[in-house]
Amino acid sequence: MQEQYRPEEIETKVQQHWDEKRTFEVTEDESKEKYYCLSMLPYPSGRLHMGHVRNYTIGDVIARYQRMLGKNVLQPIGWDAFGLPAEGAAVKNNTAPAPWTYDNIAYMKNQLKMLGFGYDWSRELATCTPEYYRWEQKFFTELYKKGLVYKKTSAVNWCPNDQTVLANEQVIDGCCWRCDTKVERKEIPQWFIKITAYADELLRDLDNLDHWPDTVKTMQRNWIGRSEGVEITFNVENSDQKLTVYTTRPDTFMGATYLAVAAGHPLAQQAAANNPALAAFIDECRNTKVAEADMATMEKKGVATGFNAIHPLTGEAVPVWAANFVLMEYGTGAVMAVPGHDQRDYEFATKYGLPIKRVIKSPEQKAYEHALEYGLGSAKNPNDFEPLTHNQRSEFLGLLTAELNKPYLEKDGETYNSGKFDGLSFEAAFNSIAAALITKGVGERKVNYRLRDWGVSRQRYWGAPIPMVTLEDGTVLPTPEDQLPVILPEDVVMDGISSPIKADPEWAKTTVNGQPALRETDTFDTFMESSWYYARYTCPQYQEGMLDSKAANYWLPVDIYIGGIEHAIMHLLYFRFFHKLMRDAGLVNSDEPAKQLLCQGMVLADAFYYVGVNGERNWVSPVDAIVERDEKGRIVKAKDAAGNELVYTGMSKMSKSKNNGIDPQVMVERYGADTVRLFMMFASPADMTLEWQESGVEGANRFLKRVWKLVYEHTSQGEAPALNVGALSEDQQALRRDVHKTIAKVTDDIGRRQTFNTAIAAIMELMNKLARAPQEGEQDRALMREALLAVVRMLNPFTPHACFTLWQELKGEGDIDNAPWPVADESAMVENTTLVVVQVNGKVRGKITVAVDATEEQVRERAGQEHLVAKYLEGVTVRKVIYVPGKLLNLVVG
């Protein structure tokens, strides 16, 4: 065995062994318990970043641990390879997206192998290949035939720079999340999948996901947004149109003082024909921000349409306004406004001088009115009231006025100003007013969802073509199965403006049943590919259909899925939805795709910048920052090599924008893959943010060197004898107890608690004890071998290259990749001694170690031999002894 730990020599050798032996390739085996460990597949951007490394290290640690438990472990990897960045990179590099993508895949694959991840590479897939997306296209046509797919013209967020539609979540402060261009509103035809048909099941089944983070489940519940309410129809004066609104607060209906419609609503469009101000407002709204965060914070604007609706219960005229906070694609494109009980409605009414009518009496309002009418009562005798003084009356009038001059938003009051519905609680008013509306034929109880159908059309090139065609007579049909896959041409020229398949009229031409037809030139949202890849991993070479159900049902559901919480309401919702679609198509038999979700925390690093000549921020890599620290290690001053004074902004997420990413490859070349992996798992709990500190990486490297050194010293002494547990001394038994307690703790930390950092800490603590342990005697060496074999196996999931080599040097049986996880010996963990605190007159004077079965007399005798205790007993008489067996001895002296 070489004396020095040299990762650059051992890691490549071990990786070659895994490749040659196909160590991590698996097949279905009904005789073994399966375990499917999956990390979210990467986008092939060109190079791995530390976020990737953290995600995949967590997955690999779990997969290797489960493998050592004897399970049949599947850990696959692939590439989420379609998407807009490839188009931009292709234009920039004067190439096409396909070669750029495939080159990146090849490079990143080598990086993943360099880190020692135990993937089944035989299952590798790339979502941009026809072999993959052909099944997605076929499935889409089947959904169309089921009525779960439709096309409609829809107002969308349009990025004029990228020439594509953006989801609401991709609009940040009114700008494109990717290129920061101002987003416009545009009406275009798009394809949708009816995720709303599954809204109730998606919501209900969250209750069955016991091992998903509550934060993710809450985010999905809120996104689905189930509500119970009433749909109400209003007639419109001087118009044959009707307005339909939905409200979850029919108890406030008698306080509706205006209606608001979207700028694109037919009634607003009709009114605009003779109203230039309204027409101008509608044009302005075409570019309104529609991301929900923006809707909540933007200035509320509106213009009166000139139309009045008729309140169906009072017959009163209610003005109709066009407002920028109402969207056609949400609900009916019209809302009723109750400014007395809604903050947004109140602000709008105040701004435009619209009536405000309160119809729910708050407890405060009720108390103030009661005091003004009856005076103040005694707490002991509430029927005994004293009239208010002049000052008290003024005070209560002020309080009442202040209360009435703001909207009351709660549901704990009672109705008033509501005619025959006065004096009712929320629930009673809800039911009574709903019943009255239903009786009049203008109301219907409904369950609504905030969730909208999934728009899957994208106006870009680098995506899977949508398999639909249009005949010359306008008939729209799914692409016939014998024409699938609709292959995206890869040998294209990118001009940075239009999609090559939109720019080439010949590509769209086809025939269906002998009739000329045009192919759809939109491509799928890339969330389509990432919504079912996990299932295709179970049978990537299967050619008879989308999935081999036998293989899929053996491996699915995924046992643990690892990825960032930023995917909570997009990918993870579509992921669940697609699984239910596949279930209903008879492809899988489970209801949910993954039993457990682990959301890893972000990786943070120091961020520095200097101010340029034009006031701009120039971000400097932390690698290039020369820093000064105070006595507590805090950065107090920094500059770069050019002498620029740097502003330190603290730790922030590694990103290109702040130039604070750390290249994993550089770290692996400097310290070795095992060191990087160990630091990633030790520096922070898996679900918390990780602060990158190279000093911590150096510490992980030093620890591995200590492990290597101890194994080297042990093996240099020759073969160790067999362990004879019965012949161990007390000290040897104590050390063996520590070994097996560590095995028990690490097993629990990795397997149940998934607190990997505490598992590593426990191994480090044990290593410190082993480093101090004697190795002269035969049983010392036998015990050391048992301990080191356990340590190497416990470290194996974290640092597999070093452990592979150390296992061989220790002459462990077979390869460590097939070795079982160490099992704690319960008998070894039994304590035969205990620590007793000794007090004299209630004050701690010492601690003694005694046998667990020691008598009180033996404990007293042992305490008297303790130097610190003995000096307090000199010349005094012990008058009383208080003994708590195995814990405390208190000697009362006088």
From Swiss-Prot:
Short motif ('HIGH' region): ranges: 42-52
EC number of this enzyme = 6.1.1.4
Please give the Gene Ontology molecular function terms for this protein.
Answer: aminoacyl-tRNA deacylase activity; ATP binding; leucine-tRNA ligase activity
What Pfam families does the record point to? Answer: Anticodon_1, tRNA-synt_1, tRNA-synt_1_2, tRNA-synt_1g
Keyword terms: Aminoacyl-tRNA synthetase, ATP-binding, Cytoplasm, Ligase, Nucleotide-binding, Protein biosynthesis
Where is ATP bound in this sequence?
A: 656
Question: What EC class does the entry list?
Answer: ligase
Q: Report the protein name in the record.
A: Leucine--tRNA ligase
List the taxonomic lineage. Answer: Bacteria, Pseudomonadati, Pseudomonadota, Gammaproteobacteria, Enterobacterales
Q: Which gene encodes it?
A: leuS
